[in-house]
């Protein structure tokens, strides 16, 4: 779940829907492994209790050596999937908070 808020010290500040969000680095680190395909899975709840449809998407973009660039690549992919299935995305936590122990948000805005 790359859109979860990591504990302080376990993430980086990166773009997420045009705002600075403390983002986990685990998905980006896993994507750096040689020979490993990075896939995103979306479970779409079908109407009228008909079950679920599973959608699988490959990573779009490159994963390199730069941790922040890699996390932002993951975040862009998550944003794309949320835009494809906006009614399916729900979270009940403050995605843009500063967790205890995290570096403060950068003072320069990251707005696109």
Where are each of the predicted segments found?
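Non-catalytic C-terminal accessory region of glycerolipid acyltransferases
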Residues: 1-112
